[in-house]
Curated annotation (Swiss-Prot):
Record carries keyword Membrane: yes
Pfam families: BPD_transp_1, BPD_transp_1_N
Keyword Protein biosynthesis in annotation: no
BP-aspect Gene Ontology terms: transmembrane transport
Function: Part of the ABC transporter complex GsiABCD involved in glutathione import. Probably responsible for the translocation of the substrate across the membrane.
Segments on the Cytoplasmic face: 1-8, 124-134, 190-228, 300-306
GO annotations of cellular component type: plasma membrane
Homology family: Belongs to the binding-protein-dependent transport system permease family.
Protein name: Glutathione transport system permease protein GsiC
Recorded name of the encoding gene: gsiC
Subcellular location: Cell inner membrane
Keywords: Cell inner membrane, Cell membrane, Membrane, Transmembrane, Transmembrane helix, Transport
Periplasmic side: 30-102, 156-168, 250-278
Protein backbone atom coordinates (compact mmCIF):
# COMPACT_ATOMS: atom_id res chain seq x y z
CA UNK A 1 0.00 0.00 0.00
CA UNK A 2 2.81 2.42 0.90
CA UNK A 3 4.56 1.80 -2.42
CA UNK A 4 1.28 2.36 -4.25
CA UNK A 5 0.71 5.70 -2.47
CA UNK A 6 4.28 6.84 -3.16
CA UNK A 7 3.96 5.98 -6.86
CA UNK A 8 0.71 7.93 -7.06
CA UNK A 9 2.32 10.91 -5.36
CA UNK A 10 5.25 10.81 -7.79
CA UNK A 11 2.70 10.70 -10.60
CA UNK A 12 1.53 14.13 -9.47
CA UNK A 13 4.61 15.77 -10.96
CA UNK A 14 4.01 15.14 -14.71
CA UNK A 15 0.26 15.62 -14.29
CA UNK A 16 0.63 19.02 -12.64
CA UNK A 17 3.29 20.01 -15.19
CA UNK A 18 0.88 19.28 -18.05
CA UNK A 19 -1.87 21.19 -16.26
CA UNK A 20 0.49 24.14 -15.74
CA UNK A 21 1.34 24.26 -19.45
CA UNK A 22 -2.30 24.03 -20.53
CA UNK A 23 -3.57 26.65 -18.09
CA UNK A 24 -0.73 29.03 -19.02
CA UNK A 25 -1.65 28.77 -22.69
CA UNK A 26 -5.35 29.06 -21.89
CA UNK A 27 -5.13 32.27 -19.87
CA UNK A 28 -2.91 33.92 -22.46
CA UNK A 29 -5.41 33.05 -25.20
CA UNK A 30 -8.24 34.77 -23.34
CA UNK A 31 -9.52 37.84 -25.18
CA UNK A 32 -8.72 41.16 -23.58
CA UNK A 33 -5.59 42.86 -22.32
CA UNK A 34 -5.06 42.83 -18.54
CA UNK A 35 -2.83 45.89 -18.82
CA UNK A 36 -5.66 47.87 -20.41
CA UNK A 37 -8.12 46.69 -17.75
CA UNK A 38 -5.76 47.64 -14.92
CA UNK A 39 -4.76 50.98 -16.44
CA UNK A 40 -8.41 51.98 -16.87
CA UNK A 41 -10.49 53.16 -19.82
CA UNK A 42 -8.95 56.66 -19.82
CA UNK A 43 -5.34 55.46 -20.10
CA UNK A 44 -3.42 56.23 -23.28
CA UNK A 45 -1.13 53.86 -25.18
CA UNK A 46 1.98 55.01 -23.29
CA UNK A 47 0.45 54.25 -19.89
CA UNK A 48 -0.79 50.85 -21.10
CA UNK A 49 2.69 50.02 -22.43
CA UNK A 50 4.19 50.99 -19.07
CA UNK A 51 1.73 48.74 -17.22
CA UNK A 52 2.51 45.86 -19.58
CA UNK A 53 6.21 46.32 -18.86
CA UNK A 54 5.61 46.36 -15.09
CA UNK A 55 3.57 43.15 -15.33
CA UNK A 56 6.14 41.45 -17.56
CA UNK A 57 3.62 41.02 -20.37
CA UNK A 58 5.91 42.68 -22.90
CA UNK A 59 8.28 39.70 -22.84
CA UNK A 60 8.01 36.75 -25.27
CA UNK A 61 5.58 34.02 -24.28
CA UNK A 62 8.26 31.37 -23.71
CA UNK A 63 10.15 33.74 -21.40
CA UNK A 64 6.97 34.38 -19.40
CA UNK A 65 6.31 30.65 -19.16
CA UNK A 66 9.84 29.82 -18.00
CA UNK A 67 9.67 32.51 -15.34
CA UNK A 68 6.26 31.23 -14.23
CA UNK A 69 7.42 27.59 -13.96
CA UNK A 70 10.64 28.40 -12.10
CA UNK A 71 8.74 30.52 -9.59
CA UNK A 72 6.07 27.84 -9.07
CA UNK A 73 8.74 25.21 -8.38
CA UNK A 74 10.05 27.51 -5.67
CA UNK A 75 6.57 27.87 -4.17
CA UNK A 76 6.11 31.39 -5.52
CA UNK A 77 2.85 31.83 -7.44
CA UNK A 78 3.52 35.46 -8.19
CA UNK A 79 1.65 38.63 -7.37
CA UNK A 80 -1.93 39.45 -8.24
CA UNK A 81 -2.12 41.95 -11.08
CA UNK A 82 -5.18 43.57 -9.51
CA UNK A 83 -4.61 43.68 -5.75
CA UNK A 84 -0.79 43.59 -5.93
CA UNK A 85 -0.85 41.07 -3.07
CA UNK A 86 0.97 37.71 -3.24
CA UNK A 87 -1.26 35.11 -4.89
CA UNK A 88 -0.66 32.71 -2.01
CA UNK A 89 -2.16 35.27 0.39
CA UNK A 90 -5.15 35.85 -1.88
CA UNK A 91 -5.88 32.12 -2.04
CA UNK A 92 -5.22 31.51 1.66
CA UNK A 93 -7.72 34.20 2.65
CA UNK A 94 -10.41 32.58 0.47
CA UNK A 95 -9.64 28.90 1.02
CA UNK A 96 -11.26 28.28 4.41
CA UNK A 97 -14.70 29.74 3.51
CA UNK A 98 -14.82 27.49 0.45
CA UNK A 99 -13.54 24.47 2.40
CA UNK A 100 -16.12 24.83 5.20
CA UNK A 101 -18.91 25.43 2.69
CA UNK A 102 -17.84 22.29 0.82
CA UNK A 103 -17.67 20.18 3.99
CA UNK A 104 -21.09 21.28 5.27
CA UNK A 105 -22.63 20.71 1.84
CA UNK A 106 -21.00 17.29 1.53
CA UNK A 107 -22.06 16.10 4.99
CA UNK A 108 -25.77 16.74 4.57
CA UNK A 109 -25.77 15.70 0.91
CA UNK A 110 -24.11 12.32 1.59
CA UNK A 111 -26.23 11.50 4.64
CA UNK A 112 -29.50 12.55 3.04
CA UNK A 113 -28.68 11.08 -0.37
CA UNK A 114 -27.57 7.72 1.01
CA UNK A 115 -30.63 7.48 3.27
CA UNK A 116 -32.92 8.15 0.31
CA UNK A 117 -31.01 5.68 -1.87
CA UNK A 118 -31.07 2.89 0.73
CA UNK A 119 -34.78 3.40 1.42
CA UNK A 120 -35.52 3.40 -2.32
CA UNK A 121 -33.58 0.16 -2.81
CA UNK A 122 -35.13 -1.65 0.17
CA UNK A 123 -38.67 -0.62 -0.83
CA UNK A 124 -38.03 -0.91 -4.54
CA UNK A 125 -40.95 -0.05 -6.87
CA UNK A 126 -43.02 1.17 -3.92
CA UNK A 127 -43.87 4.70 -2.81
CA UNK A 128 -40.54 5.38 -0.97
CA UNK A 129 -38.71 4.46 -4.16
CA UNK A 130 -40.91 6.64 -6.37
CA UNK A 131 -40.81 9.59 -3.99
CA UNK A 132 -37.05 9.37 -3.48
CA UNK A 133 -36.23 9.12 -7.18
CA UNK A 134 -38.62 11.98 -7.97
CA UNK A 135 -36.75 14.16 -5.48
CA UNK A 136 -33.43 13.01 -6.96
CA UNK A 137 -34.40 13.85 -10.53
CA UNK A 138 -35.72 17.23 -9.39
CA UNK A 139 -32.49 18.02 -7.56
CA UNK A 140 -30.35 17.12 -10.56
CA UNK A 141 -32.53 19.04 -13.02
CA UNK A 142 -32.85 22.28 -11.03
CA UNK A 143 -30.01 24.74 -11.86
CA UNK A 144 -27.94 25.77 -8.86
CA UNK A 145 -28.27 29.50 -9.51
CA UNK A 146 -32.06 29.23 -9.81
CA UNK A 147 -32.32 27.15 -6.63
CA UNK A 148 -30.10 29.60 -4.77
CA UNK A 149 -32.16 32.61 -5.82
CA UNK A 150 -35.40 30.78 -4.97
CA UNK A 151 -34.18 29.85 -1.48
CA UNK A 152 -32.90 33.37 -0.95
CA UNK A 153 -36.25 34.85 -2.01
CA UNK A 154 -38.26 32.57 0.29
CA UNK A 155 -36.13 32.33 3.43
CA UNK A 156 -34.31 35.68 3.33
CA UNK A 157 -36.57 38.18 1.58
CA UNK A 158 -40.09 36.87 2.25
CA UNK A 159 -39.69 35.17 5.64
CA UNK A 160 -36.59 36.98 6.87
CA UNK A 161 -35.30 33.88 8.66
CA UNK A 162 -31.80 33.70 7.19
CA UNK A 163 -29.18 36.22 5.98
CA UNK A 164 -28.70 36.64 2.26
CA UNK A 165 -24.98 37.15 1.69
CA UNK A 166 -21.74 36.90 3.65
CA UNK A 167 -19.99 34.22 5.72
CA UNK A 168 -19.90 35.71 9.20
CA UNK A 169 -21.96 33.13 11.16
CA UNK A 170 -23.26 29.56 10.91
CA UNK A 171 -26.57 30.91 9.61
CA UNK A 172 -24.82 32.19 6.49
CA UNK A 173 -23.88 28.59 5.62
CA UNK A 174 -27.43 27.21 5.50
CA UNK A 175 -28.69 28.50 2.15
CA UNK A 176 -25.40 28.16 0.21
CA UNK A 177 -24.82 24.62 1.52
CA UNK A 178 -28.38 23.59 0.64
CA UNK A 179 -27.93 25.03 -2.84
CA UNK A 180 -24.50 23.51 -3.39
CA UNK A 181 -25.37 20.10 -1.97
CA UNK A 182 -28.73 19.58 -3.69
CA UNK A 183 -27.29 18.11 -6.89
CA UNK A 184 -24.79 16.00 -4.93
CA UNK A 185 -27.54 14.57 -2.70
CA UNK A 186 -29.53 13.68 -5.81
CA UNK A 187 -26.58 11.94 -7.46
CA UNK A 188 -25.76 10.07 -4.25
CA UNK A 189 -29.38 8.93 -3.89
CA UNK A 190 -29.54 7.50 -7.41
CA UNK A 191 -26.08 5.93 -7.20
CA UNK A 192 -26.70 4.41 -3.75
CA UNK A 193 -30.02 2.97 -4.89
CA UNK A 194 -28.43 1.38 -7.96
CA UNK A 195 -25.58 -0.09 -5.92
CA UNK A 196 -27.88 -1.41 -3.18
CA UNK A 197 -30.31 -2.99 -5.65
CA UNK A 198 -27.41 -5.05 -7.06
CA UNK A 199 -26.16 -6.02 -3.59
CA UNK A 200 -29.58 -7.01 -2.22
CA UNK A 201 -29.91 -9.69 -4.89
CA UNK A 202 -26.56 -11.36 -4.10
CA UNK A 203 -26.37 -14.91 -2.73
CA UNK A 204 -24.77 -13.94 0.58
CA UNK A 205 -27.70 -11.61 1.30
CA UNK A 206 -30.18 -14.44 0.75
CA UNK A 207 -28.04 -16.73 2.91
CA UNK A 208 -28.06 -14.21 5.76
CA UNK A 209 -31.84 -13.95 5.57
CA UNK A 210 -32.16 -17.74 5.53
CA UNK A 211 -30.14 -17.91 8.77
CA UNK A 212 -32.78 -15.77 10.46
CA UNK A 213 -30.84 -12.51 10.54
CA UNK A 214 -33.16 -9.50 10.75
CA UNK A 215 -33.64 -7.48 7.57
CA UNK A 216 -32.25 -4.35 9.20
CA UNK A 217 -29.06 -6.15 10.23
CA UNK A 218 -28.76 -7.76 6.79
CA UNK A 219 -28.95 -4.36 5.10
CA UNK A 220 -26.62 -2.54 7.50
CA UNK A 221 -23.97 -5.22 8.08
CA UNK A 222 -23.85 -7.25 4.89
CA UNK A 223 -25.27 -4.86 2.33
CA UNK A 224 -23.82 -1.52 3.35
CA UNK A 225 -20.13 -2.50 3.25
CA UNK A 226 -20.31 -4.08 -0.20
CA UNK A 227 -22.54 -1.37 -1.63
CA UNK A 228 -20.24 1.36 -0.31
CA UNK A 229 -17.32 0.60 -2.63
CA UNK A 230 -18.77 2.27 -5.77
CA UNK A 231 -20.52 4.86 -3.58
CA UNK A 232 -17.17 5.96 -2.09
CA UNK A 233 -15.89 6.56 -5.61
CA UNK A 234 -18.82 8.82 -6.32
CA UNK A 235 -18.33 10.59 -2.97
CA UNK A 236 -14.75 11.41 -3.88
CA UNK A 237 -15.70 12.74 -7.29
CA UNK A 238 -18.53 14.80 -5.84
CA UNK A 239 -16.30 16.24 -3.12
CA UNK A 240 -13.84 17.37 -5.75
CA UNK A 241 -16.71 18.81 -7.75
CA UNK A 242 -17.96 20.76 -4.74
CA UNK A 243 -14.53 22.07 -3.81
CA UNK A 244 -13.78 23.31 -7.30
CA UNK A 245 -17.25 23.81 -8.69
CA UNK A 246 -18.85 26.19 -6.20
CA UNK A 247 -18.32 29.14 -8.54
CA UNK A 248 -21.99 29.78 -9.34
CA UNK A 249 -23.16 29.38 -5.74
CA UNK A 250 -20.43 31.66 -4.41
CA UNK A 251 -21.36 34.29 -6.98
CA UNK A 252 -25.08 34.10 -6.13
CA UNK A 253 -24.52 34.40 -2.37
CA UNK A 254 -21.53 36.77 -2.65
CA UNK A 255 -19.49 34.15 -0.80
CA UNK A 256 -15.86 35.18 -0.09
CA UNK A 257 -14.38 31.96 -1.44
CA UNK A 258 -12.16 30.59 -4.19
CA UNK A 259 -14.98 30.33 -6.72
CA UNK A 260 -15.79 34.02 -6.61
CA UNK A 261 -12.10 34.86 -6.63
CA UNK A 262 -11.69 32.83 -9.82
CA UNK A 263 -14.63 34.58 -11.52
CA UNK A 264 -13.30 38.01 -10.56
CA UNK A 265 -9.81 37.04 -11.73
CA UNK A 266 -11.09 35.89 -15.13
CA UNK A 267 -13.04 39.14 -15.51
CA UNK A 268 -9.88 41.17 -14.79
CA UNK A 269 -7.53 38.77 -16.67
CA UNK A 270 -5.51 38.30 -13.47
CA UNK A 271 -3.22 35.61 -14.92
CA UNK A 272 -1.26 34.61 -11.78
CA UNK A 273 -4.42 34.05 -9.71
CA UNK A 274 -6.15 32.05 -12.47
CA UNK A 275 -3.11 29.81 -12.97
CA UNK A 276 -2.65 29.19 -9.24
CA UNK A 277 -6.33 28.37 -8.67
CA UNK A 278 -6.53 25.91 -11.56
CA UNK A 279 -3.38 24.18 -10.32
CA UNK A 280 -4.86 24.02 -6.82
CA UNK A 281 -8.13 22.52 -8.07
CA UNK A 282 -6.22 19.93 -10.13
CA UNK A 283 -4.12 18.96 -7.11
CA UNK A 284 -7.27 18.63 -5.00
CA UNK A 285 -8.89 16.26 -7.49
CA UNK A 286 -5.80 14.07 -7.69
CA UNK A 287 -5.37 13.87 -3.90
CA UNK A 288 -9.07 13.15 -3.36
CA UNK A 289 -8.92 10.26 -5.83
CA UNK A 290 -5.87 8.93 -3.99
CA UNK A 291 -7.72 9.08 -0.66
CA UNK A 292 -10.66 7.24 -2.25
CA UNK A 293 -8.36 4.46 -3.44
CA UNK A 294 -6.91 4.09 0.05
CA UNK A 295 -10.41 3.99 1.56
CA UNK A 296 -11.26 1.01 -0.65
CA UNK A 297 -8.92 -1.20 1.38
CA UNK A 298 -10.41 0.08 4.64
CA UNK A 299 -13.97 -0.67 3.52
CA UNK A 300 -13.19 -4.03 1.94
CA UNK A 301 -9.97 -5.70 3.20
CA UNK A 302 -10.08 -8.06 0.20
CA UNK A 303 -8.88 -5.15 -1.95
CA UNK A 304 -5.12 -4.73 -2.00
CA UNK A 305 -2.84 -2.50 -4.03
CA UNK A 306 0.56 -3.49 -5.33
Amino acid sequence: MLNYVLKRLLGLIPTLLIVAVLVFLFVHLLPGDPARLIAGPEADAQVIALVRQQLGLDQPLHVQFWRYITHVLQGDFGTSMVSRRPVSEEIASRFLPTLWLTITSMIWAVLFGMAIGIAAAVWRNRWPDRLGMTLAVTGISFPAFALGMLLMQIFSVDLGWLPTVGADSWQHYILPSLTLGAAVASVMARFTRSSFVDVLSEDYMRTARAKGVSETWVVLKHGLRNAMIPVVTMMGLQFGFLLGGSIVVEKVFNWPGLGRLLVDSVDMRDYPVIQAEVLLFSLEFILINLVVDVLYAAINPAIRYK
